[in-house]
Regions:
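Glycine-rich loop-to-alpha-helix module at the N-terminal edge of alpha/beta enzyme cores
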Residues: 4
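N-terminal helix-loop segment corresponding to the beta1-alpha1 unit
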Residues: 9-182
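A glycine-rich dinucleotide-binding beta-alpha-beta segment and adjacent secondary-structure elements
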Residues: 1
Length: 182
């Protein structure tokens, strides 16, 4: 075997064929590693939607929950030829999308119905916010003990900076990484 001659096979085997139907070739069907898992992605912007995208790309059924007015990333440039945000479209591909106002009683009931049957719940609402609306891990894991709960926040759920708002650029500056990128 020539060095590098099996590269495509390694890529297809290790990462799956990049086709959305997950078939390696016409004769053999590839079953994605997360096929059969249901993920509720109640995140916005960059980090959370990217996590949801990785799960969707690995075969999970991902349902993106957007607030009334949509994910704020829908307003980001650059735009696709159809006028939508390229970043939003890229990070939210292969997901179903529902608009639910989880701050209202009706919206909370809708979201709880989805989370009850889910395998994974993603939220980036900020420390303590999910608990305030009845979506903290301690509450929803009672109805769904198998649930994997991922709460994303810049500085974690506890600690001196937990309530500080931030962005990726601020974190890069705090860590010194910004010095390497200019």
């Amino acid at each position: 075997v020539e060095p590098g001659s099996d590269t495509q096979h390694i890529i297809d085997t290790g990462f799956g064929n990049q086709q959305t139907d997950f078939k390696q070739n016409q004769d053999e069907e590839f079953i994605a590693p997360l096929a059969g898992l249901k993920v509720i992605d109640a995140t916005q912007g960059y980090t959370g939607p990217y996590v949801g995208l990785m799960l969707a790309e690995a075969g999970a059924e991902v349902i993106k929950i957007e607030p009334k007015g949509g994910d704020w990333a829908r307003d980001l440039a650059p735009r696709t030829p159809t006028g939508s945000s390229a970043l939003f479209e890229s990070f939210n591909r292969n997901k179903d999308s529902k608009t639910i106002d989880w701050t209202s009683k009706d919206g909370q009931a809708q979201l709880k119905g989805l989370v009850k049957d889910a395998d994974v719940f993603l939220e980036d609402w900020g420390p303590g916010v999910a608990e305030g609306y009845g979506f903290g891990y301690g509450t929803i894991s009672k109805e769904n003990p198998k649930l994997v709960y991922l709460a994303l926040s810049a500085y974690g759920e506890k600690g001196p900076f937990r309530d500080r708002p931030t962005s990726e650029l601020v974190i890069q500056g705090m860590t010194g990484y910004l010095r390497t990128t200019g």
